[in-house]
Regions:
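Active-site-proximal loop/helix segments of hydrolase catalytic cores
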Residues: 165-236, 244-249, 253
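Beta-strand-turn-beta hairpins that frame and shape the catalytic cleft
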Residues: 51-57, 71-76, 135-141, 184-192, ...
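Positively charged n-region of N-terminal signal peptides that target proteins for export
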Residues: 1-5
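Binuclear metal-ion centers of metallo-dependent hydrolases, dominated by the metallo-beta-lactamase
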Residues: 177, 240-308
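Bacterial N-terminal signal peptides
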Residues: 7-17
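Pre-active-site segment of Zn-dependent metallo-hydrolases
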Residues: 38-56, 60-107, 111, 115-126, ...
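Sec/Tat signal peptide C-region and signal peptidase I cleavage site
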Residues: 19-23
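Cysteine-centric segments in proteins
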Residues: 24-32
Length: 308
């Protein structure tokens, strides 16, 4: 579904296209540019693209809620790169720094340390907490303004966030750090919704954007309870689910409060009889044909995540 009711954001932007992608556009073999700059902007301005046109979409998991999505023509988007808290309020969550990967668009859902390390990747453009509509080539991003979940779900943090930070975390008077913008990325004929740490029941005005998305990325266990996830899935009826925001051995520390989602994944298979795909790598390629007829299929990266 193409969203036409949100006001467009008019921007001239930069992106990265691989040499293979530019070859698809021109029909000729074009080697990748040795320079990391906006050279490919000229190409995409000339060729454009259609986000609804079917094609292969690559999804790479960089841990936590960070996913690199590559469109059929090579536009790249990275969601929610992570870092450790610099204020001293929270302990060290991550063993390493986020890798300095090259990407066209860096996108964040909200201003928390585990989602907003937008300066770590070598991004040609940064869209922080996008609200509205943005289009580039064969990617269209729709940002939906809502609110962060204002009380952590057990066993995330035994502490109360409002008391720790001495700020108001719940609407309507929450600080900006507890705003959240759900991001819907449309490309290759697929609509992929990145939930961020949004509350379990968004503003009803957002429902028609979220219903029947193809892929829904949800922060299972640590942010949302299983009952909340079940309610979201029933309400929006996605073709596929990807759990995020969970404990990864080799990435997260024991004091992070992040939890395993193995139990939730097992329940999806045994209790809900979902088609669970346990992946053996940190990347996944999807297309509309692959998901046709699917309902609540689970793609689980397990402990596989990209490290560079």
């Amino acid at each position: 579904m193409r969203v036409k009711t949100l006001a467009p954001i008019v921007l001239f932007v930069v992106l990265t296209l691989t040499g293979d992608a530019r070859a698809q556009q021109s029909g000729k073999s074009v080697p990748p540019s040795p320079a990391w700059n906006d050279n490919s902007l000229i190409t995409v301005q000339k060729t454009g693209g259609d986000p609804t046109r079917a094609g292969d979409v690559k999804i790479e998991f960089y841990g936590h809620d960070a996913f690199k999505i590559t469109s059929p023509v090579g536009v790249t988007v990275l969601t929610d790169p992570w870092r450790n808290d610099s204020t001293g309020v929270y302990p060290k969550w991550f063993l390493n720094e986020f890798p300095t990967i090259r990407v066209g668009i860096v996108l964040s859902t909200h201003a928390h340390f585990d989602h907003d390390a937008v300066g770590r990747p070598e991004g040609l453009m940064v869209l922080e907490r996008l609200v509205g509509q943005f289009k580039l080539g064969d990617i269209e991003i729709t940002g939906l303004a809502d609110k962060h979940k204002c009380e952590p779900a057990p066993p995330d943090e035994p502490r109360n966030a409002s008391a720790d930070l001495h700020v108001e975390t719940c609407p309507p008077n929450n600080v900006i750090a507890f705003d959240n913008a759900i991001q819907i990325i449309e490309t290759g004929g697929l609509r992929i919704a990145i939930w961020g740490d949004n509350r379990a029941v968004p503003d009803p005005a957002l429902d028609h954007f979220l219903k029947n998305v193809d892929v829904l990325v949800l922060p299972v266990e640590t942010v949302l309870t299983r009952a909340e996830v079940d309610g979201i899935v029933r309400k929006y009826d996605p073709k596929a689910l990807i759990p995020s925001h969970y404990f990864l051995d080799g990435l997260a520390t024991d004091v992070s409060g992040l939890e395993s989602v193995d139990g939730w994944v097992n329940d999806q298979e045994k209790v809900h009889h979902a088609d669970v795909r346990r992946l053996n790598t940190a990347d996944l390629t999807l297309n509309a044909a692959e998901l046709k007829g699917s309902r609540h299929r689970v793609y689980y990266f397990g402990n596989h995540f990209e490290k560079k």
